[in-house]
Amino acid sequence: MAKTALKVKAARKPKFAVRGYTRCQRCGRPKAVYRKFGLCRICLREMAHRGELPGVTKSSW
């Protein structure tokens, strides 16, 4: 319940612009969120490994 409430709270427009922050759309994690995907690093990695993100490939050099 607490995580659901925090997701709703983060979705609201803050009174002051600097108070806004991103949350992972999948798990609700507040830190390490990639804005382009709207996912945290953990969810992004899992989904990329499963091939659920088109155009995202594992890089090697």
Swiss-Prot record:
Its cofactor is Zn(2+). InterPro entries: Ribosomal_uS14, Ribosomal_uS14_bact, Ribosomal_uS14_CS, Ribosomal_uS14_sf. Disulfide bonds: none annotated. Keywords: Metal-binding, Ribonucleoprotein, Ribosomal protein, RNA-binding, rRNA-binding, Zinc. The keyword Metal-binding applies. Zn(2+) binds at residues 24, 27, 40, 43. It holds the Pfam family Ribosomal_S14. Binds 1 zinc ion per subunit. Gene3D superfamilies: 30s Ribosomal Protein S14, Chain N (4.10.830.10). It comes from the Bacteria. GO terms for cellular component: cytoplasm; small ribosomal subunit. Coiled coil: none annotated. One of its GO terms (biological process) is translation. GO terms for molecular function: rRNA binding; structural constituent of ribosome; zinc ion binding. NCBIfam families: PRK08061.1. HAMAP family: Ribosomal_uS14_2_B. Belongs to the universal ribosomal protein uS14 family. Zinc-binding uS14 subfamily. Binds 16S rRNA, required for the assembly of 30S particles and may also be responsible for determining the conformation of the 16S rRNA at the A site. Part of the 30S ribosomal subunit. Contacts proteins S3 and S10. This is Small ribosomal subunit protein uS14. The lineage of its organism: Bacteria, Bacillati, Actinomycetota, Actinomycetes, Propionibacteriales.
